[in-house]
UniProtKB/Swiss-Prot annotation:
NAD(+) binds at residues 220-225. It comes from Escherichia coli O127:H6 (strain E2348/69 / EPEC). It comes from the Bacteria. The gene is astD. CDD domains: ALDH_SGSD_AstD (cd07095). Keywords: Arginine metabolism, NAD, Oxidoreductase. This is N-succinylglutamate 5-semialdehyde dehydrogenase. Catalyzes the NAD-dependent reduction of succinylglutamate semialdehyde into succinylglutamate. It is an enzyme of class 1 (oxidoreductase).
Length: 492
């Protein structure tokens, strides 16, 4: 039984799904998808649970959420292993994900009060008040790269605000989704407040098509995000928050410490085997001997990055991709770029057939036209050389996406120019593109999102504002508007 609906574990009535470790092929989890009828049951359960959950005080909801944080802490080792085995990530990185989940609780509580709390302004004849109210029933679609942390970034603020939820994990990480749901169960959420439905496209389409849904919170690919946007078009009453990845540029200008710049670039492009939505996909490198030296060093160090299994000792920097198919898609993308005229500096290699262990790839595309503006979700970095900083910014902005952008330079003036001209929601200076703070908004523009950033701003899309003018008594104004006569004289 792998679905959690209205406080009960039930067996899915859809197709059988089997999840294997992407490197070893070991069977980790199996269960049946939720069919459309079960998705409807989950929605009805969430709708029935909503009034009572929303009427609880914020403090009562906070107690349940903080209990979940405590359970994350006490089950950290077990959840770390589940995420690592299911995604192929190294143990160290999965541990940082669980830590981020724990930290998200306190941050979300603070963000609720700052972004969507209550305010009151006294007026001569009363007061003006601002409150926030939950939407109702929200669907949360989780991604596979951070199957605990990223859904958590929607679920926690949504529950704190008083919403009830139907959570569909990625079909590639059902085990992690179930493990997190079992911790929420132990936290004592009332039946129907949080429901889990497993499945792929059919389950997702059934969920997003529900009429009795007040909103949908999504993290994933641009293609799926666009499909959801089209599906919910003409329904302005439903909140839709989309985070859809990017084709992110990193500009390497002047470099004082080549190794430090190489380290930043590797952290930006290859951490999580390139499976972060903020990863650098395009590297813009200043022409000249310094740029040549940097590029040679980048290739040399990247060549030493050998992916390993989740429990390898010593621990590897990167593990496997989410699947062999995902790894092969990166290799295919590299081959297509090479066929267009790209110059391979480091070829990505599948270490062993039947696994997802893929070494990083670097290919120079300077002078090549018609390069697709697509996100290659893996460890493949494309390089362009530029002559002046204005050209670098133009090239960086030449994308339909707009999630992250970064600059390596000692010159504050150039960063200030980038801040003015960059088309991205995250713009970093001498910091990896993959570095983000939960105390700041996280999201992009263009094909990277629909202006509903998460993290610190997640509270904004989890509640709507209610403004009130209030007075505890009603009296006739001392001064009336022209044309109003409340005298006792009878007009004849």
């Amino acid at each position: 039984m792998t679905l959690w609906i209205n406080g009960d574990w039930v067996t899915g009535q859809g197709a059988l799904r089997v999840k294997r470790n992407p490197v070893s092929g070991e069977v980790l989890w199996q269960g049946n998808d939720a069919d459309a009828a079960q998705v409807g049951q989950a929605c009805r359960a969430a709708r029935a649970a909503f009034p009572r959950w929303a009427r609880l005080s914020f403090g009562d909801r906070q107690v349940r959420v903080e209990c979940f944080a405590g359970l994350l802490e006490s089950n950290k080792a077990e959840l770390t292993a589940i995420i690592a085995r299911e995604t192929g990530k190294p143990r160290w990185e999965s541990a940082t994900e669980v830590t981020a989940m724990i930290n998200k609780i306190a941050i979300s509580i603070k963000a609720y009060h700052v972004r969507t709390g209550e305010q009151r302004s006294e007026m001569p004849d009363g007061a003006a008040s601002l409150r926030h109210r939950p939407h109702g029933v929200l669907a949360v679609f989780g991604p596979y790269n951070f199957p605990g942390h990223l859904p958590n970034g929607h679920i926690v603020p949504a529950l704190l605000a008083g919403n009830t939820i139907i959570f569909k994990p990625s079909e590639l990480t059902p085990w992690s989704g179930e493990a997190v749901m079992r911790l929420w169960q132990q936290a004592g959420l009332p039946p129907g407040v949080l429901n889990l439905v497993q499945g792929g496209r059919e389950t997702g389409q059934a969920l997003s098509a529900l009429e009795d849904l007040d909103g949908l919170l999504f993290t994933g690919s641009a293609n799926t995000g666009y499909q959801l946007h089209r599906q919910l078009s003409g329904q302005p009453e439903k909140i839709l928050a989309l985070e859809m990845g990017g084709n992110n540029p990193l500009i390497i200008d002047e470099v004082a410490d080549i190794d430090a710049a190489v380290h930043l670039t590797i952290q930006s492009a290859f951490v999580t085997a390139g499976q972060r939505c903020t990863c650098a996909r395009r590297l813009f490198l200043k022409s000249g001997t310094q740029g040549d030296a940097f590029l040679a060093r980048l290739v040399a160090v990247s060549q030493r990055l050998t992916p390993g299994t989740w429990d390898d000792e010593p621990q590897p920097f990167i593990g496997g991709l989410i699947s062999e198919q995902a790894a092969q898609q990166v290799v295919t993308a590299w081959q297509e770029l090479e066929a267009m005229g790209g110059r391979t500096l480091l070829a990505p290699r599948l270490l062993q057939a039947g696994t997802s262990l893929l070494t990083p790839g670097i290919i120079e595309m300077t002078g090549v036209t018609g390069v697709p503006d697509e996100e290659v979700f893996g460890p493949l970095l494309r390089v362009w050389r530029y002559d002046n900083f204005d050209e670098a910014i133009r090239m960086a902005n030449n994308t339909r996406f707009g999630l992250s952008c970064g600059l390596v330079s000692p010159e504050r003036e150039k960063f200030d120019q980038l801040l003015l001209e960059a088309r991205a929601g995250i713009v970093n200076w001498n910091k990896p593109l993959t570095g983000a703070a939960s105390t700041a908004p996280f999201g992009g523009i263009g094909a990277s999102g629909n202006h509903r950033p998460s993290a610190w701003y997640a509270a904004d899309y989890c509640a709507w504002p209610m403004a009130s003018l209030e007075s505890d008594s009603l009296t006739l104004p001392a001064t009336l508007n022209p044309g109003l006569d409340f005298s006792d004289e009878v007009v004849r």
